[in-house]
Amino acid sequence: MNFHEYQAKQLFAEYGIPVPAGRIASSADEAVTAAKSLGNGPWMVKAQIHAGGRGKAGGVKFCKTTDEVKQAAATMLGTKMATYQSAGVALPVNLVLVTEAGEITKELYLSVLVDRGTRSITYIASSEGGVDIEHVAAETPEKIQTLNVDFVEGLQPYQGRDIGFHLGLEAKQVNQLSKIMISLYQLFNDKDLSLIELNPLAILSNGDLYALDGKINSDDNATFRHKELAAMRDKTQEDETEVLASENDLNYVTMDGNIGCMVNGAGLAMATMDVIKLNGGEPANFLDVGGGATKERVTTAFKLILSSNKVKAIFVNIFGGIVRCDMIAEGIIAAVKEVGVKVPVIVRLEGTNVDAGKQLLATSGLAIIPADDINDGAKKAVAAVTV
């Protein structure tokens, strides 16, 4: 799950990580009130969307007067903003964050993430902050420091200090960085996060470190034990179809192709998309109906797939282990009748009660195209959209 900057900073503050004072606003007048409550300025006004790169899209403004604050907020609120990190999707700006604007002397980069390669929580730090870390890694990799944390020992203070010295920080800043890193480690583990990014982690004119911008992602699989994080979810920033899918316990991801996919099991779903690509097609979605698929869930899955007008065919690929093929067949028949599917439906069934399932489809009177295996199904789906 993704979070807004202001939500990330709330969590940072709870764990003692220095952040500039700030308030959120949903109108230009509220933004002015927020600015006045923070002092005499200057201020930063920042659009709150689930994407980085807001500055280049006009979503971050430096303001010296409350009139400028009002103008900046009015320009952002109620609009949709696309950045180079939003994958071409324009996200609604419903809130702005108004913060104190400190005098920056140096910008650093610091992040915490799960490194699957080393199977560890890993820190990435750089003396080049305020820019994309990917560019730094490509152009000046010597300016990046990495630290893989031993799972048993956890992060030790000396490791944070070592990073600080390599970044060229002064003694006071080295100790501050070490404390920030330890706090981030605790936050990361306490909340089951998958990413924390401070960019920039700035040195202000008083010599202190502050997290001027922050990004966090949490592990969706752990949301059930973090109701306080679930309450922060902003569905307006998410794909409407994916939100509906999650509400129905379906794992759905929108893609750019024209062949809808309905599969049980994430691994088989990914393999299905691969085989479609291998045969020259483009999947329109990833959709895992799960091992406990019911007729109702299959019907909902069809509705989700057909919510996109790009879908020209649907490939249903089911391996009946836990789920029975005859039950899936009943669900497919009911869904096709209820939804009124107008595009070709290709079905491959294998596993428990497969013969009964195929018989139900064959005698349904519906124009359902049977497939012998995954490759045959993919070929027929590709052929259906290229007619």
Curated annotation (Swiss-Prot):
It holds the Pfam family Ligase_CoA. Gene3D superfamilies: ATP-grasp fold, A domain (3.30.1490.20), ATP-grasp fold, B domain (3.30.470.20), Succinyl-CoA synthetase domains (3.40.50.261). Disulfide bonds: none annotated. NCBIfam families: PRK00696.1, sucCoAbeta. Belongs to the succinate/malate CoA ligase beta subunit family. PANTHER family: SUCCINATE--COA LIGASE [GDP-FORMING] SUBUNIT BETA, MITOCHONDRIAL, SUCCINYL-COA SYNTHETASE BETA CHAIN. This is Succinate--CoA ligase [ADP-forming] subunit beta. The lineage of its organism: Bacteria, Pseudomonadati, Pseudomonadota, Gammaproteobacteria, Lysobacterales. The gene is sucC.
